[in-house]
């Protein structure tokens, strides 16, 4: 066996030429969509936590209230699916919210093992308060983008989301 073969066998094979593929020699983090998704999510979460703290709420409660506001009465499992969170995590959040009077729970009439959650009047009042304190953040987030661009961004992110379901 020649020395050249041993050297080439020990060295990694030439990788692709994509700036957005971390396995590529040409990779640049600024061209990697997940780099920007992580940064946007981090900044968004920091801002949301800061704003919601003013009204004694947090992002998990905000998420549950919005899911219930949009979907109406939902099971804890359905909330977990929409929130992309573990069932045990959402269960804890829902029961803390129940203690705070934001939601009510009841067994499902169809299946007593399923817990249904509905928003209370206090929860609805908190949605109004959440809208007031976060309005500027959402307006500023999409400044410089047209409605069509925001819709296109949503469609592209939805495709990526569904692509990741099959892993």
Curated annotation (Swiss-Prot):
Per the entry, what modulates this protein's activity?
A: Exposure to indole-3-acetic acid (IAA) probably relieves the repressor activity.
Q: Which PROSITE patterns match?
A: HTH_MARR_2
* Matches recorded under SMART domains: HTH_MARR
Instruction: Return the SUPFAM superfamilies for the record.
Output: Winged helix' DNA-binding domain
- Polar residues biased stretches: 1-10
InterPro entries per the record?
HTH_MarR-typ, MarR/SlyA-like, WH-like_DNA-bd_sf, WH_DNA-bd_sf
Give the transmembrane ranges: none
GO molecular function terms here? DNA binding; DNA-binding transcription factor activity
Could you mention a single GO BP entry for this protein? response to stress
Spell out the Gene3D superfamilies in the cross-references. Winged helix-like DNA-binding domain superfamily/Winged helix DNA-binding domain (1.10.10.10)
Domain of life of the source = Bacteria
Q: What induces it?
A: Induced in the presence of IAA.
- Which keywords are on file for this protein? DNA-binding, Repressor, Transcription, Transcription regulation
DNA-binding region boundaries: 76-99
Query: Region (Disordered) spans which residues?
Result: 1-25
- Could you tell me which residue ranges the HTH marR-type domain spans? 30-162
Q: Print the miscellaneous field.
A: Transformation of P.putida KT2440, which cannot degrade IAA, with the iac gene cluster confers the ability to grow on IAA as a sole source of carbon and energy, but not the ability to chemotaxis towards IAA.
The UniProt function text for this chain reads:
Probably acts as a repressor of iacA expression.
Which PANTHER family does the UniProt record give? MARR FAMILY REGULATORY PROTEIN, TRANSCRIPTIONAL REGULATOR, MARR FAMILY
What's this protein's name? Answer: HTH-type transcriptional repressor IacR
Native organism? Pseudomonas putida
> Lineage from the top down?
Bacteria, Pseudomonadati, Pseudomonadota, Gammaproteobacteria, Pseudomonadales
Gene name as annotated: iacR
């Amino acid at each position: 066996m020649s020395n050249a073969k041993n050297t080439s066998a020990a060295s990694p094979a030439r990788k692709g030429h994509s700036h957005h593929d971390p396995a590529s020699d040409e990779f640049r983090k600024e061209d990697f969509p997940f780099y920007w998704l992580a940064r946007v999510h981090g900044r968004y979460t920091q801002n949301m936590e800061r704003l919601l703290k003013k009204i004694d709420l947090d992002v998990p409660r905000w998420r549950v209230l919005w899911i219930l506001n949009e979907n109406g009465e939902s099971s804890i499992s359905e909330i977990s699916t929409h929130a992309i969170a573990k069932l045990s995590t959402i269960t804890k959040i829902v029961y803390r919210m129940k203690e705070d009077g934001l939601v009510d729970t009841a067994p499902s009439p169809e299946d007593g093992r399923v817990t249904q959650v509905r928003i209370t009047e206090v929860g609805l009042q908190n949605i109004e308060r959440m809208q007031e304190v976060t309005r500027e953040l959402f307006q500023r987030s999409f400044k410089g983008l047209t409605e069509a661009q925001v819709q296109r961004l949503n469609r592209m992110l939805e495709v990526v989301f569904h692509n990741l379901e099959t892993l």
